[in-house]
């Protein structure tokens, strides 16, 4: 029952469950962005084949399709495990919001996944069996299916961070969807999708350029390598610029609905107007928010007024810090944001009202519940400081993402310059650097997810359900055991994928 949300569950069980889900998500995200990125490269290459009818482009397409196929299979396998964990480890969450959260996942499984499965078969086995136009359409539709799949999953994730389009039913103890469009087309969902997909294109583009540079180092497949660098670097440069634009909008959206996350990203303990954006700083790893004493990162280099501009679109806009959010603050429009302690009191009122209504069916409890429902999750918070996520992790992960992203813009621009204006094969240092960019691109992408997920702690659903109340009633030992089983399984899968990819890359394209 949601009014008695597993208050006896040990913190170790919660930590192991979080670790297991994080492990699965991190491994899953090693495969997904490469799938989305390679889909674009395959589509461009086959479009060139369709328009020119040159066998060369067919060989290019089929080569990248082989690598796509291996990665696609691994992504599906880890994704299935990830969805099952909602039911096994997070059953309270599944019960509480399953009517809302389950809808986009169901659409993803029924529509997008079946779309992918249908057209991927034509893409791999339809060469010379269907018309060139239909095969080209199948290739693009495979990529579109994967992208639509990502859309619905990201809609579900965005709803957890910015819950809209739902209403709580005290009789069923569940949230019920009131507006599908509000859920599917929320500004948070749209921005999360565009930023995530463009970052995936960056991963695919980096992979293509790096593999092509390896061929140039080995003095093999010169024509394929140069053509692929042109495609990959072109896609990558466009994607990095788009990712920068959508990233800027992400910061703005986070500032509106998750101010604590933004404060953690900036290690901003005490906010104000005209806040600067920290470029470089040293954050104390164990520093805790202090109500009395201002705490600033050491060796701080900042851009004046930039944080206020990103968060409010005005150079002198007010940005709350960690302590401001804990103690309560006044918005620019004059409305007051309650302190965390006030929200905790109101959350407890909502829980008591719900419990009383469930036991007595007293109708006078429903207005109390409705009035305080927006703070329902705070009723399970024992200490206001639980609302502060890990500031060092958020701070450094954000800068790692932005720093590598900026480096990738230069990398793709230089790739295009060298392949079009110079003899790129002569620049051995660049060819080696390109290979190193693969892990860096992945680190940037994973760092973005770390900021998004660590930054919203302790919430499973922002303001409505903390992690401690979302968990299943399972034993710590069971979760710990499956954690190590999954660790071994996923590591094996990753090792197998890398070995197959390396083998296929060394083998090279197959010429008819």
State where each predicted segment sits.
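Polytopic transmembrane helical bundles with strong interfacial aromatic enrichment
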Residues: 2-512
């Amino acid at each position: 029952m949601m009014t008695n949300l597993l208050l006896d569950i040990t913190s170790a069980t919660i930590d192991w469950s979080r670790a297991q889900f994080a492990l699965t998500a991190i491994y899953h995200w090693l495969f997904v962005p490469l799938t989305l990125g390679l889909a674009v490269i395959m589509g461009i290459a086959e479009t060139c084949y369709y328009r020119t009818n040159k066998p060369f482009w067919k060989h290019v397409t089929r080569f990248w399709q082989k690598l796509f196929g291996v990665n696609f299979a691994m992504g599906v396998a880890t994704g299935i495990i990830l969805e099952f964990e909602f039911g096994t480890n997070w059953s309270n969450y599944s019960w509480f919001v399953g009517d809302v959260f389950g809808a986009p996942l169901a659409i993803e499984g029924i529509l997008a996944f079946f779309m992918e499965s249908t057209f991927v078969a034509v893409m791999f086995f339809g060469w010379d069996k269907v018309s060139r136009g239909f095969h080209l359409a199948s290739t693009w539709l495979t990529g579109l299916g994967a992208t639509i799949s990502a859309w619905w999953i990201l809609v579900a994730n965005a709803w957890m961070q910015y819950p809209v389009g739902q209403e709580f039913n005290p009789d069923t103890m569940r949230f019920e969807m009131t507006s599908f469009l509000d859920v599917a087309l929320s500004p948070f969902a749209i921005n999360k999708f565009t930023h995530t997909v463009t970052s995936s294109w960056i991963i695919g583009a980096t992979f293509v350029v790096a593999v092509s540079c390896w061929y140039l180092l080995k003095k093999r497949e010169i024509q394929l390598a140069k053509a692929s660098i042109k495609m990959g670097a072109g896609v990558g440069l466009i994607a990095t610029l788009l990712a920068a634009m959508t990233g800027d909008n992400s910061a703005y959206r986070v500032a509106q609905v998750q101010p604590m996350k933004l404060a953690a990203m900036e290690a901003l303990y005490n906010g104000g107007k005209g806040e600067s954006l920290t470029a470089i700083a040293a954050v104390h790893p164990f520093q805790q928010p202090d109500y009395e004493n201002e705490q600033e990162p050491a060796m701080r280099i900042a851009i004046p007024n930039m944080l206020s501009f990103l968060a409010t679109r005005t150079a002198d806009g007010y940005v709350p810090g960690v302590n401001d959010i804990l103690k309560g603050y006044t918005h620019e429009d004059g409305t007051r944001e309650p302190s965390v302690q006030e929200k905790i009191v109101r959350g407890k009122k909502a829980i008591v009202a719900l419990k009383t209504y469930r036991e007595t069916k007293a109708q006078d409890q429903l207005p109390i519940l409705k009035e305080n429902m927006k703070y329902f999750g705070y009723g399970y918070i024992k200490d206001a400081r639980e609302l502060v996520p890990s500031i060092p992790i958020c701070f450094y992960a954000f800068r790692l993402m932005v720093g590598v992203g900026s480096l990738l813009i230069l990398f793709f621009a230089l790739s295009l310059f060298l392949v079009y204006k110079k003899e790129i094969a002569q620049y051995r240092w660049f060819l080696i650097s390109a290979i190193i960019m693969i892990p860096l691109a992945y680190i940037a992408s994973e760092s973005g997810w770390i900021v998004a997920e660590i930054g919203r702690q302790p919430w499973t659903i922002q303001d409505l359900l903390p992690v401690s109340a979302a968990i299943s009633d399972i034993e710590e030992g069971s979760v710990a055991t499956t954690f190590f089983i999954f660790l071994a399984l996923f590591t094996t899968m990753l090792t197998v994928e890398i070995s197959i990819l390396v083998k296929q890359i060394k083998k090279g394209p197959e010429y008819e």
